[in-house]
Amino acid sequence: PIVGGSILSHSHFQGGRYVFPMQKAHIAVPLRNARYTGVKAGIVNWPVSTVRLVGRSSQEVQNAADDILRTWRDYSDTSVDIIAHTGDTPHNTVTPILHYDENDGYILDLALRNNRTTEQYPDGIFHPHKEYHNIKKENIGLIEVMGLATPPA
């Protein structure tokens, strides 16, 4: 399976002026990193594990995001079924969601994703499970991560 509704081997962009519920979510846990003094960071109060970075310097926000991505790609916690790699197959990535605010600057939300499968969940541990396919069978994509449901036709 793939993470979200997109293929990870190519760049994929969506744009528009809609304000999604995720953008209105507050920081639940502030984070600090002495290397990025111009970036405010925190864990978003949101159903999908998300780290928010806010800063005026696009380069500093990008560098902080790169550090988080590299750390997440190697992160495992078996108590919650997160395993970074199975052999040479990576499982962790992020869904980056960026917007610009005149007051705050660049706001980058990094939704942490894991595409690992098991015998019990062949479509993905963190994808809609079979008992919920009457509600949503497709992968959880960007729009759902940001707070809008896409119900079946």
Task: List PLM regions with ranges.
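Catalytic or ion-translocation cores adjacent to nucleophile or general acid/base/metal-coordination motifs
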Residues: 1-9, 15-68, 73
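C-terminal accessory/tail domains of diverse enzymes
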Residues: 44-153
